[in-house]
Design a protein with these regions (language model features):
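Zinc-dependent metalloendopeptidases
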Residues: 1-250
């Protein structure tokens, strides 16, 4: 199990605007509990999510999205993240009406609820697919569980937001804005499958700041392709981002 430590500011608002101030150190574990008894009792720091009527395991589609997101994070950071089935873990991911109407996650913390992710029950998260709202929600909430904050909000290590020119989903999955200058109170306006499929540039910078950068991923010559049917990007034939060096292609 990991423990939580404080994060220092970098004096770069592009990064500091995403840093909550907390991160994990040591081997990070995650799980998909299927019973309220999988959680500590009492659930310190939480809002009784495990014991609320309607508790359920995370939909399989969201579990797949989380696993995919963790694979991405492992590819460009030095974090060590291990799966622990349905058991106790640093990051426990499930569904509860307490999270309605959408979802939320707790920042890393040395208390029962620290790092846990909760999806609400008003949205059909079983519909999660690469590039849609539900899928990107998994990336967003896992980002919180690892120490990322909302890009449009101040607070965190330096009490700054991400600069407005980069506060949108083109640069970070932690933004409430579909495009630069969009309202944060009227919801996203992306097309159905026009949401980020990966962590974006500022997310990667912030995650690497907290957990170290792994430059071995895609460190050789790289060929980038794009599917005009699905919009998915491929690197050397694989739908995975983050060039670690080498020569780019087309």
């Amino acid at each position: 199990m990991a423990t939580t430590v404080l994060v220092s500011a970098t004096n770069n608002a592009e990064i500091d605007g995403l840093l909550s101030g907390y991160k994990w150190t040591g081997t990070i574990t995650y799980s998909f509990p299927d019973a309220s008894s999988d959680y500590p009792n009492p659930y310190y720091g939480g809002s009784s999510e495990p014991t609320t009527s309607g508790f359920a395991s995370a939909p399989s589609a969201m579990q797949s999205a989380i696993n995919y997101a963790i694979g991405l994070i492992l590819s460009y950071t030095n974090a060590t993240i291990q799966y622990n089935g349905t058991g106790s873990a640093d990051i426990m991911i499930a569904q509860s009406p307490s999270a309605n109407p959408t979802s939320y996650a707790y920042y890393p913390g040395n208390y029962a609820a620290g790092g846990d992710v909760w999806f609400g029950t008003k949205y059909n998260y079983s519909l999660a697919q690469l590039g849609n709202y539900y899928f990107t929600t998994a990336l967003h909430e896992l980002g919180h569980a690892l120490g990322l904050k909302h890009s449009q909000e101040t607070g965190g290590v330096a009490n700054v937001a991400v600069p407005s020119a980069h506060d949108d989903s083109e640069y970070t999955v932690m933004s409430y804005r579909s495009y630069v200058g969009a309202s944060t109170s009227t919801g996203y306006t992306n097309e159905a499958y026009g949401y980020p499929q990966t962590y974006m540039a500022n997310d990667i910078l912030a995650l690497q700041t907290m957990y170290g950068a792994d430059y071995t991923t895609q460190s050789g010559n790289t060929v980038y392709t794009w599917s005009p049917t699905t919009g998915q990007e491929f690197i050397n034939g694989v739908g995975q981002p983050a060039d670690g060096g080498g020569i780019g292609g087309s």
